[in-house]
Amino acid sequence: METIVNGFNQPNAQASPLAYGLTMVAAGLAIMGAGVVSVGQGMAVAKAVEAIGRNPEATSKIRSTLIMGLAIVETASIYCFIIALLIIFV
């Protein structure tokens, strides 16, 4: 059990250091995709709050549309995270 814990997330004996480094760069790029999605979500929420401030009667329509849009956009972030995990650990 100790060898599994000590060898966790370390390059294999077969993998070259360059391949391991490029793998980590690819995982970092995938996580950057998740960060870009988060910025887009923040902008969408800001515009929704602005729209509710201008037209409070449309709050329910704006909120439901916003939640649906954020759920669709969040899937891209989750996919980026899963891809990064697969790149690192598989």
Curated annotation (Swiss-Prot):
Q: Where is this site: Reversibly protonated during proton transport?
A: 74
This protein's membrane topology, according to the annotation, is: Multi-pass membrane protein
InterPro entries, alphabetized:
ATP_synth_csu_bac/chlpt, ATP_synth_F0_csu, ATP_synth_F0_csu_DDCD_BS, ATPase_proteolipid_c-like_dom, F/V-ATP_Csub_sf
Question: Pfam families per the record?
Answer: ATP-synt_C
Q: What keywords tag this UniProt record?
A: ATP synthesis, Cell membrane, CF(0), Hydrogen ion transport, Ion transport, Lipid-binding, Membrane, Transmembrane, Transmembrane helix, Transport
Q: Name one GO cellular component term.
A: proton-transporting two-sector ATPase complex, proton-transporting domain
Q: What SUPFAM superfamilies does the annotation carry?
A: F1F0 ATP synthase subunit C
- Which positions, given as ranges, span the membrane? 17-37, 70-90
Q: Which PROSITE patterns match?
A: ATPASE_C
A molecular function (GO) held by this record is:
lipid binding
Does the keyword Oxidoreductase belong to this entry? no
Q: Where in the cell is it found?
A: Cell membrane
Q: Which family does it belong to?
A: Belongs to the ATPase C chain family.
Q: Provide the assembly information.
A: F-type ATPases have 2 components, F(1) - the catalytic core - and F(0) - the membrane proton channel. F(1) has five subunits: alpha(3), beta(3), gamma(1), delta(1), epsilon(1). F(0) has three main subunits: a(1), b(2) and c(10-14). The alpha and beta chains form an alternating ring which encloses part of the gamma chain. F(1) is attached to F(0) by a central stalk formed by the gamma and epsilon chains, while a peripheral stalk is formed by the delta and b chains.
| Task performed by this protein | F(1)F(0) ATP synthase produces ATP from ADP in the presence of a proton or sodium gradient. F-type ATPases consist of two structural domains, F(1) containing the extramembraneous catalytic core and F(0) containing the membrane proton channel, linked together by a central stalk and a peripheral stalk. During catalysis, ATP synthesis in the catalytic domain of F(1) is coupled via a rotary mechanism of the central stalk subunits to proton translocation. Key component of the F(0) channel; it plays a direct role in translocation across the membrane. A homomeric c-ring of between 10-14 subunits forms the central stalk rotor element with the F(1) delta and epsilon subunits.
**Designated name of the protein:** ATP synthase subunit c
Provenance organism: Metamycoplasma arthritidis (strain 158L3-1) (Mycoplasma arthritidis)
- Which gene codes for it? atpE
